[in-house]
Amino acid sequence: MWKKKKVKAGVLLYAVTIAAIFSLLLQFYLNRQVAHYQDYALNKEKLVAFAMAKRTKDKVEQESGEQFFNLGQVSYQNKKTGLVTRVRTDKSQYEFLFPSVKIKEEKRDKKEEVATDSSEKVEKKKSEEKPEKKENS
């Protein structure tokens, strides 16, 4: 009988040791998963903030101003050193620096010039085609 008790205690000690090792491995794995998810959520938030800042950079119309998005708001200032954008979300605030941007009004003027030039070319072609038709008749 004395030997049977030792065997039972040995099996119980082995089972507790294996359970403790499994528990430690499970805890390590779960901590890795939680850290991975937190890192993913932070990177996603930074990416969304950068996308808002980039969109604001493309739509700059004044020297400074604000734009509002569903996920936050962006304030910007166009300085000599560059375009400073501050993105405020529900959870945090980010700041991005871009090269200085020309104001959009200048871009519009260029587009108008191009449109005017192309319409003038079309008018010239039409006026050149009319005399040719008269000569053929």
From Swiss-Prot:
GO biological process, one term: establishment of competence for transformation
Membrane topology summary: Single-pass membrane protein
Stretches for region Disordered: 106-137
Subcellular location: Fimbrium; Cell membrane
InterPro entries xref list: ComGG_streptococcus-type (IPR047665)
Keywords, ordered alphabetically: Cell membrane, Competence, Fimbrium, Membrane, Transmembrane, Transmembrane helix
Spans traversing the lipid bilayer: 10-30
Disruption phenotype: Prevents transformation pilus formation and transformation. Reduces level, but not processing, of ComGC. Reduces level of ComGD and abolishes detection of ComGF.
GO cellular component, one term: pilus
NCBIfam families: pilin_ComGG_2
Subunit composition and interactions: The transformation pili are flexible filaments, consisting mainly of the major pilin ComGC and smaller amounts of the minor pilins, including at least ComGD, ComGF and ComGG, and perhaps ComGE. Interacts with ComGC; the interaction is probably direct. Interacts with ComGD. Interacts with ComGE. Interacts with ComGF. May act as a link between ComGC, ComGD and ComGF.
Function as written in the Swiss-Prot or TrEMBL entry: Required for formation of the type IV-like pilus (T4P) that plays a role in transformation. Transformation pili are dynamically extended and retracted, perhaps thereby promoting DNA uptake and transformation. Required for transformation.
Protein name per its UniProtKB record: Competence protein ComGG
Originating species: Streptococcus pneumoniae (strain ATCC BAA-255 / R6)
